[in-house]
């Protein structure tokens, strides 16, 4: 079994198609989806993502859970090894460790945020963005400002190295001997290396006179080429370099047709208010001789969140709902604990086989699946083919297994069965 088979199962799911139909059309929609447990959330979202071209934003309660959901989706769609320009599953983290302290920004996170903004600008649809309240609280530069501060370059384009160097200096890039992190560039002969905030790898731009001969991404550690590019976008540190520019919320930045998946609207409101209060407290103690944007211009509070979310398509997937809307009920259960009791696991799988469930065991690595398969074969020695438990194996490291009672043909277990 492969990942596409799992998504294919859920594309035929009755409730998944109810969500798809409810989201169709231009008007704003309100859905309350209940009964989703374990990694059923990411599988259902993955199926919806496969059925439409919208931008879907999954907002979960904290960074750790957001990372798990992102990892699920990244694996479901086999995007872990894809170059960034091919990816459709994106992570939107916080940039600041502390508000107003540029030196406390996380460069890797600034890169991830810039990648999302750039991807939305260049692609605009068929994306999934995973985020959490603290990241959502930080406003972003507007589309117009991002476009104004993005320099596009094509293979075969006539442009001089001197002109490109001037652009990089103007954008705040630092010249170094070797590029190591975003925001740096280097020049050696007819080659310009640039680590843009638009890609996870730096670009190697080779010139022939005043013409761009070739563009490749490369690994800064071993200097080996990764991928040939025909067109690239050079993007500066929009988080800090453009700190005085006008900002807007991610809600305003994304297309109005974007679908927002939210667990607990009230919880997010309260968390955003707390983040805004924290920024206000720090702002009051700043050096007044240096001009800073006010907290409300840099951070989104709960009221602003309520107002802007109210004008968007929203799917609430928690136990309660803030908006009035159509209710869609799934019947899933969290995977029960087996605590390395493989006989108990087999009994459970056998019970579901008799009830005509499909038993799917998932694990991140093939060796884990092989180990489980060997254990099952040892425990079922002497049994006929009909007496043996029917199991499908899927190399997919979902964070949490679940049982789907609706399909009655789907049973999902994660690699946690052997823990």
Residue ranges, per PLM feature:
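ASCE RecA-like P-loop NTPase motor cores
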Residues: 1-411
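Single conserved hydrophobic/aromatic residue that forms the stacking wall/gate
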Residues: 412-419
């Amino acid at each position: 079994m492969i990942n596409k088979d799992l998504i294919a199962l859920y594309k035929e799911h009755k409730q998944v198609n109810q969500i798809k139909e409810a989201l169709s059309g231009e008007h704003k929609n309100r859905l309350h989806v209940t009964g989703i447990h374990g990694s059923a959330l990411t599988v259902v979202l993955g199926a919806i993502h496969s059925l439409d071209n919208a931008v879907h934003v999954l907002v979960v309660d904290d960074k750790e859970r957001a990372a798990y959901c992102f990892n699920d989706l990244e694996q479901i769609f086999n995007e872990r090894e894809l170059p960034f320009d091919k990816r459709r599953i994106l992570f939107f983290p916080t940039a600041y460790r502390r508000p107003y302290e540029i030196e406390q920004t996380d460069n890797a996170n600034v890169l991830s945020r810039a990648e999302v903004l750039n991807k939305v600008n260049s692609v605009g649809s068929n994306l999934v963005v995973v985020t959490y309240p603290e990241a959502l609280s930080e406003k972003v530069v507007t589309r117009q400002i991002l476009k104004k501060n993005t320099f596009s370059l094509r293979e075969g384009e006539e442009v001089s190295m001197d002109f490109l160097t001037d652009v990089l200096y103007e954008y705040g890039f630092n010249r170094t001997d070797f590029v190591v992190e975003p925001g740096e560039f280097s020049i050696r002969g007819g080659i310009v290396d640039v680590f843009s905030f638009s890609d996870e790898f730096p670009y190697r731009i080779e010139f022939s006179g005043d013409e761009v001969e070739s563009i490749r991404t490369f690994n800064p550690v071993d200097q080996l080429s990764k991928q040939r590019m025909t067109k690239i976008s050079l993007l500066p540190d929009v988080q800090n370099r453009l700190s005085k520019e006008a900002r807007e919320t991610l809600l305003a930045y994304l297309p109005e047709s974007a679908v927002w998946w939210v667990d607990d609207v009230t919880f997010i409101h309260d968390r955003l208010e707390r983040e805004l209060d924290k920024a206000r407290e720090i702002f009051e103690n700043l050096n007044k001789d240096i001009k800073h944007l006010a907290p409300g211009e840099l951070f989104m509070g709960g009221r602003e969140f309520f107002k802007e979310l109210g004008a968007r398509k929203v799917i609430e997937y928690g136990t309660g709902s803030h908006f009035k809307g159509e209710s869609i009920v799934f019947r899933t259960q969290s995977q029960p604990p087996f605590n390395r009791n493989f006989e108990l696991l087999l009994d459970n799988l056998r019970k579901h086989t008799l009830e005509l469930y499909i038993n799917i065991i998932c694990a991140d690595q093939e060796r884990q699946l092989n180990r489980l398969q060997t254990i099952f074969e040892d425990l079922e020695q002497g049994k006929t083919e009909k007496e043996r438990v029917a199991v499908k194996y899927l190399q997919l490291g979902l964070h949490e297994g679940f049982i789907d009672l609706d399909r009655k043909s789907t049973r999902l277990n994660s690699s946690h069965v052997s823990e």
